[in-house]
Amino acid sequence: MAYSNKFIYATLPRTQRGQPIVLGGDPKGKNFLYTNGNSVIIRNIENPAIADVYTEHSCPVNVAKYSPSGFYIASGDQSGKIRIWDTVNKEHILKNEFQPFGGPIKDISWSQDNQRIVVVGEGREKFGHVFMAETGTSVGEISGQSKPINSCDFRPARPFRIITGSEDNTIGVFEGPPFKFKMTKQDHTRFVQAVRYSPSGHLFASAGFDGKVFIYDGTTSELVGEVGSPAHKGGVYAVAWKPDGKQLLTCSGDKTCRLWDVETRELISEFPMGTAVEDQQVSCLWQGEHILTVSLSGFISYLDVNNPTKPLRVIKGHNKPITVLGLSDDRSTIYTGSHDGAVTNWNSGNGVNDRVSGNGHGNQMNGICSWGDFVYTCGIDDSLRQINIEGNSYTDAVVKLNCQPRGIAIFREQNIIALSCVKEITLVQDNRKVFSLPISYEASSCAANPETSELAVGGDDQKLRIYSLSGTTLELKTELEHLGAVTDCSYSPDNKLLVACDAHRKVVLYAVPEYKVRLFLIALSIDV
């Protein structure tokens, strides 16, 4: 049976407290870019459900930027490698790969003529490099700053200039080509986190962890003035110019974004983003009519200049690895749980999603299952918890388990939830434990067959065990040998087949109820 990719429900940007991230804007105004792990995510601004993922980096990617023409993207990773790749073809054909220095790349900027690229970061031998995009040939030297450089930008008009913002609290100014050190600006008292030219190049702005934002002349680099006094109560992570250059957006660790008039450097409006630590704002982008910000939680907010107290839209999801996935009874909703304990519900047709609220596990989840009006989850906090679907929040129902659960399955007619745990198999009925069966192996997963009242349990001892449910007790029926630790198992929707996979990437299909092998193959994945 042929299959094809229908939708990509993309990850959120990977964030880290105290670290700004960089959003890349499409010069055509259609898409925006960010990174997570080894991937670059391209998302449509109007419809974020339309997404593409570039996965050719071999280590975590820190930043990606479109060329001014929009035909190429340059992405830089933790090892100091730059990949320049095509945006037109779905295959994203690699044009060039360079290694400007050894160490994390933190920011990238293209010259307006698409010919030159400047990259900055935390190299072992230098903190920045400027080179030709076509050949990799050096076109100058980025020097004069004594600590890692966090941000850079090319002046989008002639005469070309490059500006850099460093952890030595200075702004570097370079003239060229070939680019040579011209001066440093020392108005900041803490790390400079962002430097950006206005769209015309007449001005540039800088932002730092001292909470200050300064505006400079784009040609002479003379200080024009300070924005606010200071601009924020916390560190400023990023700035973004309005396309006409008349307004400036700043985002801060004080959990606000602020909009400033460039000419008067006075506050126009403030966008309060919340009160929790996760509401710190670590990046922003002004793309046409859209104003985007990213919070420490990874949520992407579309700001409304006419109503600063409420965003137009908030894109939610996960920015940590997804460890569990389940479907609603009617298969219209997907439930996912991640490494940090967050649970998200997704509309399976269009990707619209929301984060489940309430007191959850707070750490890695190992199982999730939908049943009627509720979703049940288990995690490494050794508990079974309940989510009310209508309220989209956790309830107060919590069942404490004797050891860590690894899988969850439900016998609906019997009103029983089965949990395969590290040291035992536990049955729960009406939110209380009714049976526990000690086991001599470490269970990894389980699946319930309501027609035969059987529970399949995968173990690390290379066996798949089938238990019979009688009332509220379990009895061992049979053992099925595998060549490696069984990692997952699942019954087919009609309960006529059971599939199991193991650590050796073997997938075995059994016929129920005799559990005779129907199919044996080697898979590319070990999850079912």
Language model segments and positions:
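Short C-terminal beta-strands that terminate individual repeats in beta-propeller domains
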Residues: 8-15, 50-56, 92-100, 138-144, ...
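WD40-repeat beta-propellers
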Residues: 40-44, 82-87, 128-132, 171-175, ...
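Conserved loop/turn motif of beta-propeller repeat scaffolds
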Residues: 28-29, 70, 114, 158-159, ...
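Intrinsically disordered, low-complexity acidic/Ser/Thr/Pro-rich linker and tail segments
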Residues: 1-46, 122, 126-127, 290-301, ...
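Canonical WD40 repeat/beta-propeller blade segments in eukaryotic WD-repeat proteins
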Residues: 17-24, 59-66, 102-110, 147-154, ...
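WD40 beta-propeller repeat blades
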Residues: 99, 122-124, 186-191, 200, ...
